[in-house]
């Protein structure tokens, strides 16, 4: 793992930072950054952070982890399996099952740290990892509080497209194309990618606002990172069918612990968070809509991300 500071955000003087790794139950080694309040003593409440989907720990998840450490938590940001500095072959693949396990493995790791109070662990998922975080929390009662920030329901988008405008015939055609690709790539190895974000100088201005906003983050100095899937060639195309036959939060009634969903008022993805929130049960579920914020504003805009409210949520439920 790279030891020098190579994040897209500035290092805080209020926290200590170290690189660590931990394994999931599939035997994959995950790379992580630990952020801890300076001069902290005793066992702390801890939070594991991942996302956005297609990003690495040097991007938004690291920023969130560092901001939470500034507010008194031990926080880790990790690279999912098959991406960044984590292990797994082939590279730049995803799996709802394995990625849900990645969050649970982070809880395994935190639960065994001597400076963490094992019954005071929460998680944060950003973008597509917001949905995966809820999936993990529904499966794992050790996760006492979950934040899904600017969340995507990736299986919903994968199966029906943005704003549910896709059709079953379109989905079947995509499956046929990927099935043919699988036959070909069985002998050649995985080669074809879905494509990352569009370079800024190739944008025409006619793209949807959210497409331009993704490029403004992933393809500029603001958020570009050399190990980020979205900043470069994108995911392996074969993986895409994984979203078409799965769902997140199959049993929302099992998610008994606290949940906070955070979305931007102007986020194209807002409907996913609001619809998911409607499925949740109990008075320990909260929804925050950030005035004027877009989807990617909640990646890194410190004046838009409600870190103090997120910290207050964790302080309340990680007692």
Where in this protein do the model-derived segments appear?
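Alpha/beta-hydrolase-fold enzymes
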Residues: 134-219
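Conserved alpha/beta-hydrolase
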Residues: 67-87
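The serine-hydrolase catalytic nucleophile loop
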Residues: 54-66, 80
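Catalytic histidine-centered segment of alpha/beta-hydrolase-like enzymes
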Residues: 293-304
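Short beta-strand/loop motif that positions the catalytic acidic residue
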Residues: 255, 261-263
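N-terminal cap/lid segment of alpha/beta-hydrolase-fold proteins
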Residues: 2-42
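Alpha/beta-hydrolase active-site loop
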Residues: 93-114
